[in-house]
UniProtKB/Swiss-Prot annotation:
One of the record's GO molecular function terms: ATP binding
Protein name: Serine/threonine-protein kinase ICK
Record gene name: CILK1
Post-translational modification: Autophosphorylated on serine and threonine residues. Phosphorylation at Thr-157 increases kinase activity.
Originating organism: Homo sapiens
Mutation effect (K38R): Loss of activity and autophosphorylation
Residue numbers annotated as active site: D125
Spans annotated as Disordered: 290-344, 457-481, 582-632
Length: 632
């Protein structure tokens, strides 16, 4: 033992304690199992079951016994070091394992168990604590302290393994059991790895049998006659239970996993498959080298690789042909396609994996050991191909068809990603906007109330171009919006008496005034500075900057103004008792209530209704009270 140094204690068992050590020569980490009882001869040591079994077992999924040392009547086993056991791996897990990782773990356990059974031993104490791991990628069977040779003669002791993983024949105190008890324990461990909880957590042996009955249902006498003999021998009365569906108890297990579980958890040990038979179940036939690292990552990567490698006729996308560089829409299609083709992780189980494999028969022929796996999924695939083709036939991509596997028409434009505005097809609305802009430029400037409400794309405030903005594109000209806004506008008066209009003119009008484009009125300006800016704008319309259309570029309708401060609150005013004498002469010029009040010059443009003249300012003031007197 002077060739090893001990670092710390890893665990303490019934027959010995385990220490973490290091080899002084190589620096390799090792596990030292120190037996609690003393051994006074080598013959006594060599008769130990653990030594007998481990001397004969050399397998990748069986923990390796490096050396046996007897020193001062103490016996030490030197094992290879493993980071953790399966119980610790399950306990530290905060989310469920992917099925590919579970399949890999169970495959390694059954491989090691088949090797042990083949060499004439059965373990008798399989539980998560006795399965040593280096993460989920590598699992090895350890602790052969209770191992027995299969050819050894009964009776055996009735206490074997931890109660939760004990087979029903052992719970009923049978003394004639064999390797099927290990298969039962593997079934219990498999369910626990899926759910992260024990399947039969009984508080006692009888309670464990009750737990088994609640899951599997009460066995019939014809199904397991030996079980009824054992129960009558110990005066045990079977509870009457209805079997539960394992799929409902383990919802994240596939149908192949449930099939394997159901067979390993048979009441009758003769009906359970052997470990080598379990390895041939469809659950392990997944078309890749078994025992490799997690299948889930391969499943999620295969669709991407297939899309990048595949080059076919026009319905498929080629990865940037060198001779003819594609236009921008096509480059966007390819980039979006790779994103959409990634299946979600929680849906990658058999269906997604099979879809990706059916797309690429070359991969299937290379990797798959068996010719046909999951036949029902193959039958579904052509239908999904047809629907994908029809989906893109009309040049439309609906947002619900997010997952595609490479079938996209060349002429379509991918607009699935609504977060990217460059992908939106603005062509119909832009052509309509350009026609209207030409019509407006050919005619004189058109100023009517509908144009204010029709929030068509126009130039933003302070800029000279007419590129449509996102806000203006999304607000469409609908009759309900127009009528609702008109009622909102006509219902509220902005006239506040007692305020000097002349003093309300801004000292720096350059910030408020905009280049004289009569259609910039539909764009929203910056934050209003209260009622004074509104009145000053109206004053400037009436006095200084009245254009040929009677509307300046900086006019902002009141229904678009943000109500800020106490001066911008909606105020209903009483009639003014003593209006100015000059106001009475303007009552005849008051516009019709149903018509907008802006002044436009008469023109012969078809489809436009001539408007009555707007009220002219008197002494620099607009008669707002006379305008809205009838509306009060």
């Amino acid at each position: 033992m002077n060739r090893y140094t001990t670092i710390r204690q890893l665990g303490d068992g019934t027959y010995g304690s385990v220490l973490l050590g290091r080899s002084i020569e190589s620096g390799e980490l090792i596990a030292i199992k120190k037996m609690k009882r003393k051994f006074y001869s080598w013959e006594e040591c060599m008769n130990l079951r653990e030594v007998k079994s481990l001397k004969k077992l050399n397998h990748a999924n069986v923990v390796k016994l490096k050396e046996v040392i007897r020193e001062n009547d103490h016996l030490y086993f030197i094992f290879e070091y493993m980071k953790e056991n399966l119980y610790q791996l399950i306990k530290e897990r905060n989310k469920l394992f992917p099925e590919s990782a579970i399949r890999n773990i169970m495959y390694q356990i059954l491989q090691g168990l088949a090797f042990i059974h083949k060499h004439g031993f059965f373990h008798r104490d399989l539980k998560p604590e006795n399965l040593l791991c280096m993460g989920p990628e590598l699992v090895k069977i350890a602790d052969f302290g209770l191992a027995r040779e299969i050819r050894s003669k009964p009776p055996y002791t009735d206490y074997v393994s931890t109660r939760w993983y004990r087979a029903p024949e052992v719970l009923l105190r049978s003394t004639n059991y064999s390797s099927p008890i290990d298969v039962w324990a593997v079934g219990c461990i498999m369910a626990e790895v899926y759910t992260l909880r024990p399947l039969f957590p009984g508080a006692s042996e009888i309670d464990t049998i009750f737990k088994i009955c609640q899951v599997l249902g009460t066995p019939k006498k014809t199904d397991w006659p030996e079980g009824y003999q054992l129960s009558s021998a110990m005066n045990f009365r079977w509870p009457q239970c209805v079997p539960n569906n394992l799929k409902t108890l383990i919802p994240n297990a596939s149908s192949e996993a449930v099939q394997l579980l159901r067979d390993m958890l048979q009441w009758d040990p003769k009906k359970r498959p052997t470990a080598s038979q379990a390895l041939r179940y469809p659950y392990f036939q997944v078309g890749h080298p078994l025992g490799s690292t997690t299948q889930n990552l391969q499943d999620s990567e295969k669709p991407q690789k297939g899309i990048l490698e595949k080059a076919g006729p026009p319905p498929y996308i080629k990865p940037v042909p060198p001779a003819q560089p594609p236009a921008k829409p096509h480059t966007r299609i390819s980039s979006r396609q790779h994103q959409a083709s990634q299946p979600p992780l929680h849906l990658t189980y058999p269906y997604k994996a099979e879809v990706s494999r059916t797309d690429h028969p070359s991969h299937l022929q290379e990797d798959k050991p068996s010719p046909l796996l999951f036949p029902s999924l193959h039958n579904k695939h052509p239908q999904s191909k047809i629907t994908a083709g029809l989906e893109h036939k009309n040049g439309e991509i609906k947002p619900k068809s997010r997952r595609r596997w490479g079938l996209i028409s060349r002429s379509t434009k991918d607009s699935d990603d609504w977060a990217d505005l460059d992908d939106l097809d603005f062509s119909p609305s832009l052509s309509r906007i350009d026609l209207k802009n030409k019509k407006r430029q050919s005619d004189d400037t058109l100023c009517r109330f509908e144009s204010v409400l029709d929030l068509k794309p126009s130039e933003p405030v302070g800029t000279g171009n007419s590129a449509p903005t996102q806000t203006s594109y999304q607000r469409r000209d609908t009759p309900t919006l127009r009528s609702a806004a008109k009622q909102h506008y006509l219902k509220h008066s902005r006239y506040l008496p007692g305020i000097s209009i002349r003093n309300g003119i801004l000292s720096n009008p350059g910030k408020e005034f905009i280049p004289p484009n009569p259609w910039s009125s539909s764009g929203l300006s910056g934050k209003s500075s209260g009622t004074m800016s509104v009145i000053s704008k109206v004053n400037s319309v009436g006095s200084s900057s009245t254009s040929s259309s009677g509307l300046t570029g900086n006019y902002v309708p009141s229904f678009l103004k943000k109500e800020i401060g106490s001066a911008m609150q909606r105020v209903h005013l009483a009639p003014i008792p003593d209006p100015s004498p000059g106001y009475s002469s303007l009552k005849a010029m008051r516009p019709h209530p149903g018509r907008p009040f802006f002044h436009t010059q008469p023109r012969s443009t078809p489809g436009l209704i001539p408007r009555p003249p707007a009220a002219q300012p008197v002494h620099g003031r607009t008669d707002w009270a006379s305008k809205y007197a009838s509306r009060r």
